[in-house]
């Protein structure tokens, strides 16, 4: 929608759109910053933010408390400890043209009241496509590494950051007592390609691009996995410092290099707008010759005193801007359209392309979004691509922008063959032959086959064993497909319970898994160990693993907190499926309690009811609950707990559960947990790589136990 259309909005229409934009931008912030799974390109995201800002400028009285204009990043994950930034980690405003850069320079001059005759030095450097990280050093030693998070509170990933060779553990030379160094964690393209080969050999999902690989590698719960990935780090700024050690941005970079950091060698000091634009185009031409991905150029006022005077607006500094590169495009032929079936039955069209290189990457597949997109219809029913549909055999324009899967953005109509026929989206599921229906108001067509659909069944098992669900190492995509498709009843896995009975079935079998291609004695033993380690699991993870529609990680935690234990949740869900015919759902106490939980509501409630109405789902659950135990969200029996009232500290990497899970479990059993040792600490649980806390515990006389002793203690 263009600016003149915004000016035609009524106040009611503007308020409605601002509400939608707030929700949509927040959703994409979470997908990008927390889940490392963006759905839209940087350009599309920036367009949403620009539209939000333009409507707010026209209707300032309608600015919402949750306006995206005031937000940075996304809420942090609950998998990591929180780390509060002493100075906010702000994002940058974007420029998309030379005119935007010129306006930035003019704004800076106006704010500082600098005449045109006075030189204004700017530093320019490539904008690395990675994950922002803040490193805090005290007395020259690294004490904390934190992700950006929401800009104010990030995730503590110190153990993982220590495995990156570009990050010094101890600073060199003369340095401030306290200094926060900020920069970008990234992965070189060659290392990214090698990692994906390794992922595929292990039957695991490949990463979409180096940025996602870097982010996923840094945010591992096991630092040994991070250490196995070849991550790099460029320093580009400072946060809190105890003393001023430079007068300019370039001077700061030179000092950071002396301290032992890696600085991007392409950084340059520039004295005019013309030079800035020339530098931008020069790097744009050279970007594919670099060993790492960049998505623009960052300009900063060089003088640090001027930076202080310029200060900040709500979510970005006035003294810096990111000049983004345009999305990269190429022309190729659409050879076919494949339909993929997801775990919820969604039919997703994927374009099969004649191989084409876009942005240094060979592209053979691209997103087609949904049925309407192929027909030339937008999300609000408006025509897109001038109403042209997409047909097999068309010459198409493919765009690769930032972190998202490549997408077809247009066709070359004049190259279309006269014989090309319109694509007919299937009304039957390609995996099981069941009807595929499209509900009113939805863009997605879904298979109605449910649990008889093999494609859905495989995807549901993959979801069940995924990292944020049961997190069973050794059950990647290839392994799940193998176990699902094999005919031997002692090896097959068709339901979650089958995972946990596999070892028992194998003990009575003449066909041994160790002798199957791709397996061996060691890998099978590790698989059984990984499975058995998950026989007790937090309630929130259990609920998420069930794959109930709309019950993602966040809603699973909400439900776990509300019901505390699985029996209470299941009882409520079953009661909610039986509304009183006279008064309807509103008269059903269980339904009202369920849908009144913050963030749940009728849509999620209906999905839960639909899940529990299905007899087969209840049978699958019954079998699963014979094998696993969902742990109560909060123990009501702490009085007899051997750790009730004790102060416990965890250090190092635990192998049977994450440190966050161990802390939550300790607290449910009545203990208090802390991140630091003191004379009041009763117990230190030391995993692999406990480090300095072990020494300090001995000095303080604190009892130290390993993970096995910890498990024996709590199982008691």
UniProtKB/Swiss-Prot annotation:
What's one GO MF term for it? DNA ligase (NAD+) activity
Q: Cellular component GO terms, alphabetically?
A: cytosol
Q: Which Pfam families match?
A: BRCT, DNA_ligase_aden, DNA_ligase_OB, DNA_ligase_ZBD, HHH_2
CDD domains attached here? BRCT_DNA_ligase_like (cd17748), LIGANc (cd00114)
Q: What's its EC?
A: 6.5.1.2
Q: Which cofactors, if any, are listed as required? A: Mg(2+); Mn(2+)
Catalysed reaction equations from the record: NAD(+) + (deoxyribonucleotide)n-3'-hydroxyl + 5'-phospho-(deoxyribonucleotide)m = (deoxyribonucleotide)n+m + AMP + beta-nicotinamide D-nucleotide
> Which keywords does this Swiss-Prot/TrEMBL entry list?
DNA damage, DNA repair, DNA replication, Ligase, Magnesium, Manganese, Metal-binding, NAD, Zinc
Which residues are noted in the entry as Zn(2+)-binding? 429, 432, 447, 453
Any idea which residues are catalytic in this one? 127 (n6-amp-lysine intermediate)
The protein's job, in short, is: DNA ligase that catalyzes the formation of phosphodiester linkages between 5'-phosphoryl and 3'-hydroxyl groups in double-stranded DNA using NAD as a coenzyme and as the energy source for the reaction. It is essential for DNA replication and repair of damaged DNA.
Q: What family is reported?
A: Belongs to the NAD-dependent DNA ligase family. LigA subfamily.
UniProt-recorded name of the protein? DNA ligase
Which organism does this record belong to? Answer: Bartonella henselae (strain ATCC 49882 / DSM 28221 / CCUG 30454 / Houston 1) (Rochalimaea henselae)
């Amino acid at each position: 929608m263009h600016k003149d259309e915004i000016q035609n909005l009524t106040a009611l229409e503007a308020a409605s759109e601002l509400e939608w934009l707030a929700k949509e931008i927040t959703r994409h912030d979470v997908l990008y910053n927390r889940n490392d799974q963006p759905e839209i390109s940087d350009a599309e995201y920036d367009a949403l933010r620009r539209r939000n800002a333009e409507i707010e400028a026209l209707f300032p009285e309608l600015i919402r408390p949750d306006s995206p204009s005031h937000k940075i990043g996304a809420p942090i994950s609950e998998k990591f400890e929180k780390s509060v930034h002493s100075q906010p980690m702000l994002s940058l405003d974007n420029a998309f043209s030379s005119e935007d850069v010129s306006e930035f320079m003019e704004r800076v001059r106006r704010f500082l009241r600098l005449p045109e005759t006075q030189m204004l030095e700017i530093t320019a450097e490539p904008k690395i496509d990675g994950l922002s990280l803040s490193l805090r050093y005290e007395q020259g030693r690294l004490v904390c590494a934190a992700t950006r998070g929401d800009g104010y509170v990030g995730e503590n990933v110190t153990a993982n950051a220590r495995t990156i060779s570009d990050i010094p553990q101890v600073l060199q030379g003369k340095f401030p007592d306290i200094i926060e160094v900020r920069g970008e964690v990234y992965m070189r393209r060659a290392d990214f390609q090698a990692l994906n080969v390794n992922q595929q050999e292990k039957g695991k999902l490949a990463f979409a691009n180096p940025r996602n690989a870097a982010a996923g590698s840094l945010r591992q719960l096991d630092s040994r996995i991070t250490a196995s990935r070849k991550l790099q780090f460029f320093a580009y700024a400072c946060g809190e410092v105890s003393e001023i050690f430079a007068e300019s941005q370039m001077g700061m970079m030179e000092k950071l290099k002396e301290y032992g950091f890696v600085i991007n060698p392409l950084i340059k000091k520039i004295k005019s707008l013309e030079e800035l634009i020339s530098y931008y185009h020069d790097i744009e031409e050279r970007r594919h010759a670099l060993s790492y991905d960049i998505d623009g150029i960052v300009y900063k006022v060089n003088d640090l005193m001027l930076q202080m005077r310029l200060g900040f607006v709500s979510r970005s500094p006035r003294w810096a801007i990111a000049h983004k590169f345009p999305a990269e495009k190429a022309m190729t032929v659409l050879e076919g359209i494949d339909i993929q079936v997801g775990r919820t039955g969604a039919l997703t069209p994927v374009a099969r392309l004649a191989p084409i290189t876009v942005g240094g990457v060979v592209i053979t597949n691209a997103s087609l979004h949904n049925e309407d997109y192929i027909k030339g219809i937008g999300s609000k029913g408006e025509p897109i691509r001038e109403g042209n549909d997409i047909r097999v055999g068309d010459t198409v324009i493919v765009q690769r922008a930032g972190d998202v899967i490549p997408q077809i953005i247009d066709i070359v109509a004049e190259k279309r063959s006269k014989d090309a026929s319109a694509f007919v989206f299937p009304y039957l599921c390609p995996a099981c032959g069941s009807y595929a229906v499209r509900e009113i108001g939805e863009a997605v067509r879904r298979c109605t086959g449910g649990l008889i659909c093999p494609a859905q069944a495989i995807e549901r098992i993959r979801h069940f064993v995924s990292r944020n669900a049961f997190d069973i190492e050794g059950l990647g995509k290839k392994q799940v497909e193998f176990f699902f498709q094999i005919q031997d009843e002692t090896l097959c896995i068709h339901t979650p319970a089958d995972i946990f009975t596999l070892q028992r079935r194998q003990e009575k079998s003449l066909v041994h898994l160790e002798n199957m291609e791709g397996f061996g004695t060691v890998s099978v033993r590790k698989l059984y160990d990984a499975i058995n380690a998950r026989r007790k699991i937090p309630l929130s993870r259990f609920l998420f693993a069930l794959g109930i529609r709309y019950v993602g990680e966040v809603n699973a935690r909400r439900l776990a907190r509300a019901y505390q234990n699985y029996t209470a949740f299941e009882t409520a869900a079953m009661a909610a499926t039986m509304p009183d015919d006279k008064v309807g759902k509103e008269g059903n106490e269980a339904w009202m309690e369920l849908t009144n939980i913050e963030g749940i509501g009728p849509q999620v409630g209906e999905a839960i009811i639909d899940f529990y109405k299905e007899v087969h789902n209840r049978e699958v659950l019954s079998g699963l609950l014979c094998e696993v135990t969902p742990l109560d969200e909060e123990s009501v029996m702490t009085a007899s707990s051997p750790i009730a009232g004790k102060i416990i500290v965890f250090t190092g990497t635990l192998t049977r559960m994450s440190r966050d899970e161990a802390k939550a479990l300790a607290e449910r059993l009545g203990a208090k947990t802390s991140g630091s040792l003191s004379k009041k600490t009763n117990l230190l649980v030391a995993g692999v790589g406990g480090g300095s806390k072990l020494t300090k515990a001995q000095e303080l006389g604190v009892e130290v136990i390993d993970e096995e002793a910890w498990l024996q203690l709590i199982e008691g």
